[in-house]
Amino acid sequence: MDLFSHLNWYSGDFMNEDGEPIKSIPSGKLILVSDTLESEGSFLIHYFLQSIFKATTSTNSSTNNNNSNNSGGVGGGACLLGLNQSLYNYFNVGRKLGYNLTTEYNKGNFTFINGLSTPYKWIIEQRLQQLEDQGIDEEPQLDSISQGFNPFPTIHLIDNKNITSSSSSSSYSNSNNKNKNNNELKDILYKIYNEFINDHKKRVMNNNNNSKTLFIIDGLNLLESHYSTNPSGSNMDILNFLQYCHNYIKENSTTCSMIILYHSDCDEDSKFFNLLQYESDLTINITGLKSGYSKDIDGQLNFIQKDEKNNTFTRVNPIHYQALDNSIRFFSMGSRIQ
């Protein structure tokens, strides 16, 4: 069973010429993935990456073979904001699932935004100071361990210097900022927005509007929790940022989508989570099994789909999942003995 064909069948918007649901990520959608401490949802991030890279490979193969009957969806790339895991982890899991992030980067299919700090920068600065004290002009190459895992160029969202941006000249900015933390958050969100937009435009230009871009935020809680003491209300800044992203996705509904991972049990106040659900076109809630532990099934995916025309929400039939070392399997309810 395929996750996306299950969702596309219910929406009815993404069908091939034979009337079958396309096995690809829905276009023009803001998708919220909600998990908990007991049912962690990072496996879906890796599944999304696997799906879009395999769709790209399948599309390229079909083009080379002049095969017009491809039902695997349109290929594309991903722009991943890593706030939850290191690039090393994404890379290793990708190898197990059958794709190589370095290869995808070289093809122009993958961009990584490092939302975490740069822990190895102090080593380089200390080494430069030592070389200067010794009167050595040329810097010897650091070993790979000291440099950190960096198989290809990445974008650093945060470094050890103060973040500066020209956000005052953008319609996305607010000139009446009084709080330093609020200014910093706005600058970070502004930079994320720009990186997403630039990555999408670059991919569209290089592929003649035939390539999709998947924006991924893994996960949103770090931005929320880091600025939770902000008296001006950082949650509204994040929601405004998502609304800007959502509007851009709607304007380019055939070539981009966004996935957001959010840990719904990290905050006692559920208002922010409810607002996230209201903004999203589709919410995927990951939960454990009501019947308890099962060796064949890890948990359940519940879906809430938004109907923009009627401004209503509909529950889609849930499915079960099993996360293995080198694959992720999905099952219809009742198709496997628990």
Curated annotation (Swiss-Prot):
InterPro entries per UniProt: ELP6 (IPR018627), P-loop_NTPase (IPR027417)
Keywords linked to the UniProt accession: tRNA processing
GO CC terms: elongator holoenzyme complex
Organism domain of life: Eukaryota
Listed Pfam families: ELP6 (PF09807)
GO process terms (BP): positive regulation of cell migration; tRNA wobble uridine modification
Record flagged with keyword Transport: no
Pathway the protein contributes to: tRNA modification; 5-methoxycarbonylmethyl-2-thiouridine-tRNA biosynthesis
Functional description taken from the UniProt entry: Component of the elongator complex which is required for multiple tRNA modifications, including mcm5U (5-methoxycarbonylmethyl uridine), mcm5s2U (5-methoxycarbonylmethyl-2-thiouridine), and ncm5U (5-carbamoylmethyl uridine). The elongator complex catalyzes formation of carboxymethyluridine in the wobble base at position 34 in tRNAs.
Family label: Belongs to the ELP6 family.
Subunit structure: Component of the elongator complex.
Protein name according to UniProt: Elongator complex protein 6
Native source organism of the sequence: Dictyostelium discoideum (Social amoeba)
Lineage: Eukaryota, Amoebozoa, Evosea, Eumycetozoa, Dictyostelia
Gene that specifies this protein: elp6
